[in-house]
Amino acid sequence: MNNLIKSKLELLPTSPGCYIHKDKNGTIIYVGKAKNLRNRVRSYFRGSHDTKTEALVSEIVDFEFIVTESNIEALLLEINLIKENKPKYNIMLKDDKSYPFIKITNERYPRLIITRQVKKDGGLYFGPYPDVGAANEIKRLLDRIFPFRKCTNPPSKVCFYYHIGQCMAHTICKKDEAYFKSMAQEVSDFLKGQDDKIIDDLKSKMAVAAQSMEFERAAEYRDLIQAIGTLRTKQRVMAKDLQNRDVFGYYVDKGWMCVQVFFVRQGKLIERDVNLFPYFNDPDEDFLTYVGQFYQEKSHLVPNEVLIPQDIDEEAVKALVDSKILKPQRGEKKQLVNLAIKNARVSLEQKFNLLEKSVEKTQGAIENLGRLLQIPTPVRIESFDNSNIMGTSPVSAMVVFVNGKPSKKDYRKYKIKTVVGPDDYASMREVIRRRYGRVQREALTPPDLIVIDGGQGQVNIAKQVIQEELGLDIPIAGLQKNDKHQTHELLFGDPLEVVDLSRNSQEFFLLQRIQDEVHRFAITFHRQLRSKNSFSSQLDGIDGLGPKRKQNLMKHFKSLTKIKEASVDEIVEVGVPRVVAEAVQRKLNPQGEALPQVAEERVDYQTEGNHNEP
């Protein structure tokens, strides 16, 4: 952090607004919004972060901010700034993603065409459709039923389509404007699923043709009826009211968000839009940013209704979308939202599963790593990382990979007990001594390789404890990061040397996953500990509020900020007596006192590998 940033951090207001991060070239690399600019912007330059946020922070050389009157105003400003500047670290929707529409042109002799551009030109647009193949299938069927003009410039004499009954030969046919309006209305009814009248007409024509011994013509009508039936089957009915609506669902895990949007048109689910991206703020805030960007895309027409999950601010979405916004509580609409959320979860799980798939590649990676380090194949790898903020709440974490895959049941967390102040070497000495002292005492199976998230100093400390103090023979390697906090090089040997390791190799990708995982696990534990300590300390001394009620409050509200903003009645609903709820509000809302930054962080008491070493 440079002196300019340090000075600016002191001047930040507590108002809502937008902040703009810039790199060394003055280029805007990230735009964000905040309810409290001081707390949010300072958080980037304090404490540990996950890999993606560290990469962002490493490029920040300057920042600006814009104060707004409200959170919603900040949200709208953020969306406009992102659209204007296209910062590389912000959420970006898929490029050039536009869906096809079927259009009846506004011409004297209308045509039925497929287009990806919706214009205010008097034409009638139907869609969007999931892809051009689906749109073409429907158009081919419409061409066989409705004789619209096919030629861009009508020829002076009748064309091929006239002879096969798919064109009225407008140069010789004297149909008036009312005729074409009527035909356009029939197309509209058909595309809305109101096709019973058309099927009845085709059945009548088929019967007349059969009676007249025109069997080929009767067979054509039969085929058309069957084609309509097939199309009906393909377009699954999701709602009985035949409304046009967009259904949003999202899911977050490991610093990533997946948003799924179901396009329901005329009660039929015609397509879904899937986007996965890393998020940097609270998930619900980044979700709102996504929605705002989504409807700025010209290809995304605003439907009659937009359905959103329960935890999203309805008023904020109303400010973004000129449509009816619903948070359904029950029924088929609630089922649609649940389905979108479920699909978002599945998509995100698939993303992470793909990283852990391919047994052959993973097995090959650990075998190659063993050959590279000249050690037996490291079937079991244990990796360590420390986390603290200026020496407060220092912790360490260990993750275990067996056969190249995370073994989460073997993960361990450590509260550093003997170190005072920010001493990373001493913390590493303590945790290595505790872990492998226990391995030695209890005759546990040692790992085939220890990987330290750190450089030469941390690795040498681990070697001293393992080899000199405990007399164990376990290979130890170090993973150093570059100035962008990315996995950079592998250290190994005696003395330590940089291992010649290709960045495109499977063994490099394996080490990268191990380093990212131990870093994530350590930071998650540290944040939980800080948040829990802050939470407990701010609510200490309130009569009637014991550990169980504190835990219930945190599980329900997720953060001190939300407890502070809650009404007494909302706190009572969690099972807290009214007199205690009133005491909580008095404690958290003293006149003029600001809430500490740590209260913004969310806490999850159900993290994996929740085991502590002695």
UniProtKB/Swiss-Prot annotation:
Sequence ranges assigned to domain UVR in this UniProt record: 196-231
Instruction: Give the chief site where it resides.
Output: cytoplasm
Q: Where is the composition biased (Basic and acidic residues)?
A: 599-614
> Which ranges carry the GIY-YIG domain?
14-91
Instruction: Please give the GO cellular component terms listed in this UniProt entry.
Output: cytoplasm; excinuclease repair complex
Q: Does the keyword rRNA-binding apply?
A: no
Identify its protein family: Belongs to the UvrC family.
UniProt protein name: UvrABC system protein C
This chain's source organism reads Streptococcus pneumoniae serotype 4 (strain ATCC BAA-334 / TIGR4)
